[in-house]
Amino acid sequence: MNFTVGFKPLLGDAHNMDNLEKQLICPICLEMFSKPVVILPCQHNLCRKCANDVFQASNPLWQSRGSTTVSSGGRFRCPSCRHEVVLDRHGVYGLQRNLLVENIIDIYKQESSRPLHSKAEQHLMCEEHEDEKINIYCLSCEVPTCSLCKVFGAHKDCEVAPLPTIYKRQKSELSDGIAMLVAGNDRVQAVITQMEEVCQTIEDNSRRQKQLLNQKFETLCAVLEERKGELLQALARVQEEKLQRVRSLIRQYGDHLEASSKLVESAIQSMEEPQMALYLQQAKELINKVGAMSKVELAGRPEPGYESMEQFSVIVEHVAEMLRTIDFQPGASGDEEDDEVTLDGEEGNTGLEEERLDGPEGLH
């Protein structure tokens, strides 16, 4: 579902409300999305309950939450585009919630509950000339005013314009800004989803490498147990460093998304103000906030291959005198398990060089 139009048409228009409602229909239950709303990797949305129904139907042997049996996940196809969705052991509860869509649904329901154009149009009166309506806009001072103020009042030397002209201009400017923010929110949501997948890949790769280490160290004697602990600690340290970095980025992107969504909601509510003068009193500040939010630069994502843990691949050779020199091979690609480890000391050096575990470039 794509909401990048940013509510450019006002929600107060009945035709546009009908069009928006069509975009908020779940393809499974054919009703308006019910919270929580989850977003699939293909960027389509479903009620979490509906997603769970489809998932359970596609995976009849999968154990639901609360079961004592540990499940390995499952898969199902998106009902909108048929893209295959692969889930982890958490099932549909591991899918990201689409808070933006949930906020839009709340706003839509609020708008639908009240009659259109319920507020009678009123005119603000000039504070200096109580019998004069505010009907022009001072471009120099950037405030609404009345005709008498222009003729012989405080704004007689200022440049002015008709109130409706400035009203339409600034409303269009704010609407365009909202569209940019909503489009940016979609991109941020996609980035968050991708980085969560990176976290999962890091954990999967780390788990695989730990299993390989354990399998190979089981064949060695007690002296290997000490070294195995050292290597596992190094792997876990780098894993934690990587996960902390990616999770920190996820929190940063999430905070930006939340702030941007709140600003979008505030701007949309401001656009619903039917009084031009009241609207213009707060429009400039909102426009500035929207512009500033649109220019916020987020921290870069992890570089390609950041999730790889292949540098921790090892292979065990039965050379007892070199056991204590086993170390992770710097820059190991992990393509062939037979090349996963090097034995320091082949030239006669059998000393334990533990300082290489503290900070080799291949581990960072």
UniProtKB/Swiss-Prot annotation:
Give positions of region: Mediates microtubule-binding and homooligomerization.
168-211
**Where are stretches of biased composition, namely Acidic residues?**
334-347
* Chain ranges of zinc fingers (B box-type): 121-163
Q: Its principal location?
A: cytoplasm
Residue spans of biased composition, Basic and acidic residues class: 353-364
GO terms of molecular function: microtubule binding; ubiquitin protein ligase activity; zinc ion binding
Annotated region Disordered: the residues are 328-364
Q: Where are the zinc fingers (RING-type)?
A: 26-82
A GO cellular component term found in this entry reads:
cytoplasm
Segments forming a coiled coil: 194-252
For the ligand (Zn(2+)), the binding residues are: C126, H129, C149, H155
**Location in the cell:** Cytoplasm, Cytoskeleton; Cytoplasm, Myofibril, Sarcomere, Z line
Pfam families per the UniProt record, alphabetical: zf-B_box, zf-RING_UBOX
Keywords for this entry?
Coiled coil, Cytoplasm, Cytoskeleton, Developmental protein, Differentiation, Metal-binding, Microtubule, Zinc, Zinc-finger
Would you kindly state one Gene Ontology biological process term found in this protein's UniProt entry? cell differentiation
UniProt function note: May bind and stabilize microtubules during myotubes formation.
| Quaternary assembly | Homooligomer and heterooligomer. Interacts with TRIM63 and probably with TRIM55. Interacts with tubulin.
Name of the protein this chain belongs to: Tripartite motif-containing protein 54
Q: Which organism is it from?
A: Rattus norvegicus
